[in-house]
Amino acid sequence: MPWLQIRLAITPDQAGALEDRLLELGAVSVTFMDAEDQPIFEPDLGTTPLWSHTHLLALFEADTDADALLAHLRLLRGGELPEHQVERIKDQDWERSWMDNFQPMRFGRRLWIVPSWHQAPEPGAVNLLLDPGLAFGTGTHPTTALCLEWLDGQELAGRSLLDFGCGSGILAIAALLLGAERAVGTDIDPQALQASRDNALRNGIDPARFPLHLPADLPRQPADVVVANILAGPLVQLAPQLASLVRPGGRLALSGILAEQAGEVRAAYEGAFVLAPTTEKDGWVRIDGVRR
């Protein structure tokens, strides 16, 4: 069955009203997708976590009048529409175009992120199976890649890890597959925790090795390794808390930081950590170090 798809480039503050209106106009589904595989940041309590650049995809039955839909949306927006695209698609094209965007990716020497519908290119490597979706972080964004490459280079055997702002769980699961004994994940969004749980099961991770918590329920036990891929502002605000969650001699890796923000973040952590030189990738950076 063919479908009419409307794609809108939106910001988080536009999401609620547009979603409600599109459903009222007959959309059979409304989906939010990350426009750039950006890291999820900590949203305000009670809000839906979205990326700063988000694509809204609304699917309608094929005989829907696209011009009438756009006219309704234009009225809702005071005569203006966000950047948009209208196309008619087949079921098979819809599925194939989505799946073809995600190919296996290698990080460091050992680690591969493999969409679950692909064969692992190196069956003997450390292969993390992942279904890209709402669950925040597929490995394609530089910040995720920086963290995965760092984890691949660490000696994790027998270590404990905390993934602060775990999203899909990709970093914690990678650490467990690379030899960590236990990982704890925390995220403000319950959907992210469920996605982390699902991804862990897909990779054969015993739930006892990967407990998940909302921030208010997070145990205050320091870990050997802490990773936090969120954004610079929250990282600066959370510096005392994150420092307290790394044991003396333990390691910390931070990302979600633009290159021009590195100085501010380093200043917030250099009192508690011996920091390595900043690592940059495509305008984003990773800051890592050892707890004093």
Swiss-Prot record:
Enzyme class: transferase
GO MF terms held by the record: protein-lysine N-methyltransferase activity
Binding residues annotated for S-adenosyl-L-methionine, in chain numbering: 144, 165, 187, 229
Keywords assigned by UniProt, alphabetized: Cytoplasm, Methyltransferase, S-adenosyl-L-methionine, Transferase
Cellular component, GO annotation: cytosol
Pfam families: PrmA
Record-listed E.C. numbers: 2.1.1.-
Top-rank taxon: Bacteria
Signal peptide boundaries: none
Record's catalysed reaction(s): L-lysyl-[protein] + 3 S-adenosyl-L-methionine = N(6),N(6),N(6)-trimethyl-L-lysyl-[protein] + 3 S-adenosyl-L-homocysteine + 3 H(+)
Annotated compartments: Cytoplasm
Any GO BP: methylation
Primary site of residence: cytoplasm
InterPro entries on file: Ribosomal_L11_MeTrfase_PrmA (IPR050078), Ribosomal_PrmA_MeTrfase (IPR004498), SAM-dependent_MTases_sf (IPR029063)
Role summary: Methylates ribosomal protein L11.
HAMAP family assigned to the protein according to its UniProt record, in alphabetical order: Methyltr_PrmA
Entry's family note: Belongs to the methyltransferase superfamily. PrmA family.
Name the UniProt record assigns to this protein: Ribosomal protein L11 methyltransferase
